[in-house]
Amino acid sequence: MTDSLPLLLRAARGESVNRPPVWMMRQAGRYMKVYRELRDNHPSFRERSENPDLSYEISMQPFREFKPDGVILFSDILTPLPGMGIDFDIVESKGPLINDPIRTLEQVKTLRPLEPQVSLPFVGEVLGRLRESVKNEAAVLGFVGAPWTLAAYVVEGKSSKNYSVIKAMAFQQPDLLHKLLNHFAESIANYLKYQIESGAQVVQMFDSWAGQLSPIDYDNYAAPYQKKVVDLVKQSHPDTPMILYISGSAGVIERMAKTGVDIVSLDWTVDMAEGCARLPNNIGIQGNVDPGILFGTPKMIQERIIDTVKKAKGRKHILNLGHGILPGTPEENAKVFFETGKNINNLISNI
């Protein structure tokens, strides 16, 4: 009986469900008081994300508080980098810093293939514990950064406003960049397989910075490597739903659907009805409520969620934000988001 499986897993597979499942990107994090208290005692982000007890606890915090339909591993897209020979740190309020940015062929040649069982055992442990804890009340989600976004961080050395260093590499030394992207695609595919084998039931690939690319460059530097990751994972795990999210994706939505993923996660700058019209019927849709709406009134939050769900009616839909929840969001408004999502049928029938 598939009815005993988590709602989010069934919906992501395209099965008929009685409402869209609901979870939030970054649902474990700074907006929650319990997270901030834990952070005060453990100020290192890498410790919080790489110590299995802390990562498990943080992953479970929103589940205990809000009972979302998905529980996502608390980690970071850069977590696998040290396993490939790239050290990094995450500085509070500044973001990631790569100690030795990758700029030469010699550096690319020294990168190691990722062996997640060896370098990331804590990830497997946390995913297994999450599955044990949430049982079928929620689906356990794993995630990775896509090759272009990982390359953007390791070439730039930090977050960037215009990505001029990696774009210079793309337009001056494309062969070098392709070698780096290919290395990441193979390693990230192995990492996703490891997450699935450890307990992840649905996985999401974040290509956060692919929205900085023109469509022609998306076709050259992002899409082929997204597709390579998907193809490699689907060879061994064809039934695990895969989601692709890009921030600022309005110009490449149709291209996202061609990578082989099961679900395209829309950001909030695209009208849900237009997003649905631009995607083939076999592709599921996740999103796409503006995270800023969670600073509004409960009535406004409800209205916006109802609008989003109604526009996605008839499609395989997972209710989510169009970006991660923002720091400073009132916790009670996050609760309104989850409760509205879970009570959506009653709310729509009463309109």
Swiss-Prot record:
Which GO cellular component term is one of those annotated? cytoplasm
Enzyme Commission designation: 4.1.1.37
Which UniProt keywords are listed?
Cytoplasm, Decarboxylase, Lyase, Porphyrin biosynthesis
For the ligand (substrate), the binding residues are: 26-30, 45, 76, 153, 208, 323
Pathway where it operates: Porphyrin-containing compound metabolism; protoporphyrin-IX biosynthesis; coproporphyrinogen-III from 5-aminolevulinate: step 4/4
- Site Transition state stabilizer — annotated at 76
Q: Which top EC class is given?
A: lyase
Task: List the signal peptide residues.
Answer: none
What are the BP-aspect GO terms? protoporphyrinogen IX biosynthetic process
Q: Tell me the SUPFAM superfamilies matching this sequence.
A: UROD/MetE-like
Report the locations given in the UniProt record. Cytoplasm
Q: Does the keyword Cytoplasm apply?
A: yes
GO molecular function term, any single one:
uroporphyrinogen decarboxylase activity
Q: How does it assemble?
A: Homodimer.
Family, according to the entry, reads as follows:
Belongs to the uroporphyrinogen decarboxylase family.
By what name is this protein known? Uroporphyrinogen decarboxylase
Q: Which gene encodes it?
A: hemE
